[in-house]
Amino acid sequence: MRRHARKLEACHHRPFWRFLRRFGVDPTGHGWDGWLHTERPPKELEAEALGDAAMLQMIGVTSAEFARRLKNPLATIFRWAHSAGDPNSRPWRSRDFEGLCYTPLSTCGRRRIGSRERLLQVRGKHADRLHIECNALATRVLFDAEGTACGVEYLKGARLYRAHANPSAARGERCEVRARREVILCGGAFNTPQLLMLSGIGSAEQLRRHGIEVRVDLPGVGRNLQDRYEVAVTYRMRGPWKILEGARFERGDPVWQRWHRQKEGLYASNGAALAFVRRSAPNIPDPDIFCMALPAQFDGYYPGFSANLKKYDDRLTWAVLKAHTHNNAGTVTLKSADPLEPPRIDFHYFEEGDDTQGRDLKALVDAIQFIRELNRPLLHCGLLTEEAPGPDALTAPALAEYVRNNAWGHHASCSCPIGLRANGGVVDSSFAVHGVRGLRVVDASVFPRIPGFFLVSAVYMIAEKAAETLLHEARRKST
């Protein structure tokens, strides 16, 4: 998939190699001419952060403590220097790497960029080929007399889906759109399996239970749901962060004005002061723990979570992320045949799932203990005080209970996986739905196992692969 990654990326945070690649020298594995621009925080912001005595002490002490615990610190430091702290550089993909890194940003000119900007860019260039319909809720796939997918039925109207925080009581206007060639579903890990089931594709038993005519008995639809785990270790600093002066995290505040006019300052970053990757166990092939330090109170995503950014200016949060999770027992099932009703989503976290050895839970507990070790000197000198998990969670069992009660995830995937139909697969290697002509799925639901630390780049890569597959097949059929 490296080829697809290079095709979509436009890397701006390795200027030396960006220059040398013009002469055929490029060991980094980055892409340079794609649509997804990647940058790192401005140099002046890094200098300002190090001008904050508390920030400098935190970064210096925790970095030294991390290096002291490395099995081979000289080799790791050499690799860090070779890649300049870039976590996505090809040399870092050596299977024995663990170390400190910076967190690249998907920004262009200090403005966030993603699939939204890509779609608008393509629509601007090819308005005759791409039409974007807002306030439209897909309700089912349409089929012709031969059973080939030929379109999508949808409801037109705002806030129709009852997952909305303020759903409308209206039912919407029923509409249809027809496909000349194929239908491609990109609804994500929750809505793609729901839409397939509403269209008669899924577990026959479940479909009949809701009065839906069975078109294809495909039990893998909505199964294999996965996510990674994330949990927070939070400290209270001795005083407010200097770097947060003037930041009210709202449009028009002094920090926003600086970003708006000069594209500088705190709002030109994601807020991560320090990050590292490591293994939760020495015998696993790839690092599976990513931790980053944020000068903020952050304990997950929930309605109003960002209010804590305004409320506290003296917090340090270590966000602990467990990747390559072992639990694939999550499910997406229908609550009813009503397309306005969200599906029932159950990840079956930890012991509820199929990670019977408790490897994910143990990895998170060990990571919290590791964060505590890194910050112990700062506790002893009075720079910070632990807020969470706190003094009531000192033992491994108490930390395990803290993780069970507070872990979250926001990279749901794998609910319509690529694979053999007999093994629970929903789509084949060309993203075509088993047992159906003219229907494909291209989104986060198609992964058999959740990839990497952060899902979005992997989704972009499979989208590039799917585009290549579709174009190849279209050319083959036209000859």
Question: What is the predicted role of each segment?
Answer:
Residues 1-479:
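Structural core of flavin- and non-heme-iron oxidoreductases
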